[in-house]
Amino acid sequence: MPAPYEKGSAKKGATLFKTRCLQCHTTEAGGAHKVGPNLNGVFGRHSGQAEGYSYTDANKQKGALWEAQTMSDYLENPKKYIPGTKMAFGGLKKAKDRNDLVTYLLSATK
C-alpha cells in the first residue's frame, strides 16, 4: 500500500517537475497540451477529463478523483494505478519525492 501523502517541499517538487514532468506536461492556465495533458486545474477533477486532450479509455474509465493522495498513489507507478495508460513515466518510488512533487503541483496547477 502506498505511503500516505504528507506535505513536502514545493521547491524540491518544482525541481522534480522540471526534470521529470515538464517534457510532457504544462501547468499554466490556458497552456497547451503536450505529449501529456496540461495539468492546470487537475485537483478536484476526475482522470481522463482535461478538455481537448485525447485520453486512453483506461484513463477515462478509471474515474479517479485527483486529490493529493490519489495523485501520490498514481505517481508511485502510473501503469499499475491505471493499467492501459499511455503515460510512459515509470513512477517515483520514494514517498518523499512524491510528497514534494504533489505539494508543488497543488500550488502550480491552481
UniProtKB/Swiss-Prot annotation:
Which domain of life does the UniProt lineage start with? Eukaryota
The PTM N6,N6,N6-trimethyllysine maps to: K79
User: What's a GO cellular component annotated to this UniProt protein?
Assistant: mitochondrial intermembrane space
User: Sorted alphabetically, which InterPro entries does this protein's record hold?
Assistant: Cyt_c-like_dom, Cyt_c-like_dom_sf, Cyt_c_1A/1B
From the Swiss-Prot or TrEMBL record, state where the protein is found: Mitochondrion intermembrane space
Per UniProt, which keywords does this protein have?
Electron transport, Heme, Iron, Metal-binding, Methylation, Mitochondrion, Respiratory chain, Transport
Where heme c binds, per the record, is at C21, C24, H25, M87
Gene Ontology MF, one: electron transfer activity
Task: State the post-translational modifications.
Answer: Binds 1 heme c group covalently per subunit.
> Gene3D superfamilies, from UniProt?
Cytochrome c-like domain
Pfam assignment, any one: Cytochrom_C
Q: Which family does it belong to?
A: Belongs to the cytochrome c family.
Question: What role does this protein play?
Answer: Electron carrier protein. The oxidized form of the cytochrome c heme group can accept an electron from the heme group of the cytochrome c1 subunit of cytochrome reductase. Cytochrome c then transfers this electron to the cytochrome oxidase complex, the final protein carrier in the mitochondrial electron-transport chain.
The name on file for this protein is: Cytochrome c
What organism is recorded for this protein? Pachysolen tannophilus (Yeast)
- The primary gene name is CYC1
